[in-house]
């Protein structure tokens, strides 16, 4: 039995949006789900969906009606949205878990203590085909929380301990610019290297904002996102939003050394490596100049490096007899996002 889909008219009557923005156009949501071709990944009668900060939940109801997953849980604790969800979905298969998605304990309580939502574990040789995470991180805390989630993918913890769990995440367009920045981009930073290292992330949809051109033409051509009107979001004012499809990839990166190398070099992201490399430790320039096989690599700036090149430099760093104690390093990993 289908569930009621909240209308634009009813959703815009919610008094507080708590600084978040939501796409409220059922036709565009349907286009998005068609584009994602989720049936090729998931066994729908076995799929469990965890929807974080669902807000007015129009997208949630549409997903439920199209795919009819085994379980659909909405996690939200914001009072006006909680009331709206209860008014619209009481007595349906849509389950509300009234906790804050920001808190780590919300997940441990839900999964381990209360057993309200218990995903199975799968091997990391493919995307988990019975567990999907959806989220809206367009509010003030969104970018920082998204960076934490990317780190969790790399560390294979949080919800990613169950396998390679796909995430469909709404973020501010500016955040999408940052995490999708390619080597050579002026805004290339640690967050985009993390995204490249641990995920295959695609731009699924974005608004027709005046800043759309900040995405590279090659990215727009390759990802072919759905472009929707800024009028289809509520609230209409403020910064535009984008939808990212985050597919975790399996990796065997030496995380501690890789983290040290990438964050130190990217502080000097526009400085050629032959100079910036000394930031890894005293004597670094001489050591790396001797060990790096492709001497042209040392002429590159950190912002121009691919993750593969960072991994290569990390392997050299790891074999350095006089490398510094990386555990005595106190540089903030997200310093470039502040």
From Swiss-Prot:
Function statement: Mitochondrial transcription factor that confers selective promoter recognition on the core subunit of the yeast mitochondrial RNA polymerase. Interacts with DNA in a non-specific manner.
Gene coding for it: MTF1
Stated family: Belongs to the class I-like SAM-binding methyltransferase superfamily. rRNA adenine N(6)-methyltransferase family.
Record protein name field: Mitochondrial transcription factor 1
Localization, UniProt: Mitochondrion
Binding site for S-adenosyl-L-methionine: 23, 76, 100, 136
Gene Ontology CC entries for this record: mitochondrial DNA-directed RNA polymerase complex; mitochondrial matrix
SUPFAM superfamilies from the UniProt entry: S-adenosyl-L-methionine-dependent methyltransferases
Entry EC number(s): 2.1.1.-
Organism encoding this protein: Lachancea kluyveri
GO biological process: methylation; transcription initiation at mitochondrial promoter
Biological classification of the source: Eukaryota, Fungi, Dikarya, Ascomycota, Saccharomycotina
Pfam short name (any one): RrnaAD
């Amino acid at each position: 039995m289908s569930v009621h889909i909240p209308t634009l008219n009813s959703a815009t009557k919610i008094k507080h949006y708590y600084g978040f923005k939501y796409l409220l156009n059922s036709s565009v949501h349907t286009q998005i789900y068609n584009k994602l071709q989720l049936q090729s990944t998931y066994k729908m009668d076995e799929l469990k969906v965890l929807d974080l900060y669902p807000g007015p939940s129009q997208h949630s109801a549409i997903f439920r009606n199209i795919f009819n997953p085994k379980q659909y849980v909405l996690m939200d604790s914001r009072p006006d949205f909680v009331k709206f969800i209860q008014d619209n979905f009481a007595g349906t298969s849509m389950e509300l878990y009234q906790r804050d998605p920001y808190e780590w304990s919300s997940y441990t309580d839900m999964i381990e203590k209360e057993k309200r939502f218990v995903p199975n574990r799968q091997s990391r040789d493919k995307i988990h085909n019975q567990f999907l995470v959806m989220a809206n991180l367009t509010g003030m805390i969104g970018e920082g929380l998204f960076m934490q989630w990317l780190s969790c993918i790399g560390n294979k913890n949080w919800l990613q301990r169950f396998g390679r769990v796909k995430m469909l995440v709404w973020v501010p367009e500016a955040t999408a610019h940052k995490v999708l920045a390619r080597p050579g981009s002026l805004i290339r930073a640690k967050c985009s290297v993390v995204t490249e290292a641990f995920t295959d992330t695609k731009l699924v949809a974005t608004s027709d904002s005046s800043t759309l051109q900040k995405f590279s033409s090659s990215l727009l051509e390759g990802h072919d996102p759905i472009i929707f009107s800024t009028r289809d979001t509520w609230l209409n004012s403020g910064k535009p939003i984008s939808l990212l499809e985050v597919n975790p990839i399996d990796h065997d990166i030496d995380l501690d050394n890789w983290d040290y190398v990438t964050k130190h070099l990217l502080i000097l992201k526009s400085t050629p490596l032959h100079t910036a490399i000394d930031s890894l430790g005293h004597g670094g320039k001489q050591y790396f100049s001797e060990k790096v096989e492709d001497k042209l690599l040392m002429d590159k700036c950190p912002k121009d490096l691919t993750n593969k090149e960072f991994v290569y430099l990390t392997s050299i760093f790891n074999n350095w007899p006089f490398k510094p104690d990386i555990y005595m390093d106190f540089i903030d990993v997200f310093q470039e996002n502040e």
